[in-house]
Amino acid sequence: MANLAVKVADLEAACDWYASAGATVTEPVAWENGRRADVMLGALQITLFTKAIYEDATTLPDEGFLHPALFVDDLDAELARHEKVLWGPRVVSGSFGTRRIAFVDAPGGMRLEFMEQIEDPN
């Protein structure tokens, strides 16, 4: 697993809260259609988003758990196992390098993000 994604209404307040809990928190940055920051809390990485990249494809609450992000070796093979892809695949780049990503709906009213690493970070 790469990280857990959480949507927050107030990114700065969420970053401050995690920092006061002892986490290492990156500075918020612009990301796709919103902003994001990464939180390292022990072995757990949480990515805080103000807007999910797939928000136009599904109904989401203003705040809450979005999805776990999972690495796969072959995104196309993974997606072939699912009846419907909610969003993607699409190539994204950032401090994490370059990845192909896609999202599927999963039982329990949640989504899964599958990520294939194309280029490692510089």
Language model features with spans:
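Mid-chain, well-packed structural core segment of small domains
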Residues: P61-W87
